[in-house]
Amino acid sequence: MPVPSALVCVHCSARYPTTHYDQDCPACRAKGISANLTVAYDSRPGEGLDQERPPHRPGSLWRWDDFLHASAAEAVSLGEGNTPLLHAPSLGLGDVWIKDESRNPTWSFKDRLASGALTMAKKFGAKVIASSSSGNAGAAAAAFAAKAGIPCVVFTFVGSAGPLVLQMRAYGAMVVKVTDKADRWRLQTLGVREFGWYPTSPFFGPVVGSNPYGMEAYKTIAYEVAESFDWDVPDWCVLPVCYGDALYGMWKGFEELKAIGWTRRVPRFVAAEVSGSLPAALASGDPMPPVTTRNAPTIATSIGAAQGTVQSLDVLRKTNGAAVTVEDDEMRRWVVKLAAKEGIWPEASSAAPFAAIEHLRAKGTIKPNERSVALLTAAGLKDPGPIEQALPEPPVVNGGLKELMAALKNSYGFNHG
């Protein structure tokens, strides 16, 4: 099993101690670039394993601990990972597959991040967990902190989705709301710097991404996808992107599989955004994604940031990928379509990859014979507002069969007995 030997800048490869997890890369910062760190190991992850007999430990993403920063025996786990990969031909998007992360313990992909981060928090002897979150990351941090027996403070903002905030509270987190979103980071920074609270989420700007040890757990999505396709990786991986933690983690996972000879190539990656920051950076060639001028609120609060990250931008460039700006009406339409056609109800942000695939197929970027995997990051129950706004009100029927059929026709266009 590999052992973490350093934290390395995702952009310039500068090396730092393994305890540098609460900071960005000072070398890049001096050049005006804000870059996250990633875990480097004393040996190549997965090297020496038999591809014909990959890990078969039951229960969680920690079956892949030969690729990770801690052992399954040390892990703080709630059975996260091993989510289904579902073929979705009814969507009209060609050979598209859904990696359904809504099946995780708190119903989002953030459970992987939380498990990876809390495992190291426990190893480091953390006394308090701190997270700044609009919902999913905070709920996951709260749940895994509860499992680890470590107090958790979550900073969120007034207006965050009610079910998500309730979920954080249900897991025992000390939830603090702020009026100004920037105050989340200011207060969390004070806790981290003054008291040594262990951060699982971004908490300073410009944002670089989340806890490097948490991001390692996202590599397992790549392992699961590759294994599901008998190690023939898809042509495209399409993700909803805010700060790009899962984007970077998946890319790193595919790179590791290629490095040990389990796969032949790495997929091209697509970031589905609402801000347009990454598309602007790809077009300009700048090393830093810009802060966009988009001020309108979005239904996709999980990806509502106004600025992308270097870690996202670098992955898109390295894989000859793409970034697509999606609109609220597109996501709302895809939420309804996914629920009605595939029986999967995603949160609004999780619908963004499908809108992006639609755009890229129309442009000819994604070819008809190419396979795409869309990461569905969280369940619609966490924020039901978008689909509620898009659906008709159920009719009230007082009467018999005639009245019933009239109501079904008027409300739903249903004409069959």
Language-model features: locations:
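PLP-dependent amino-acid enzyme catalytic core
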Residues: M1-G417
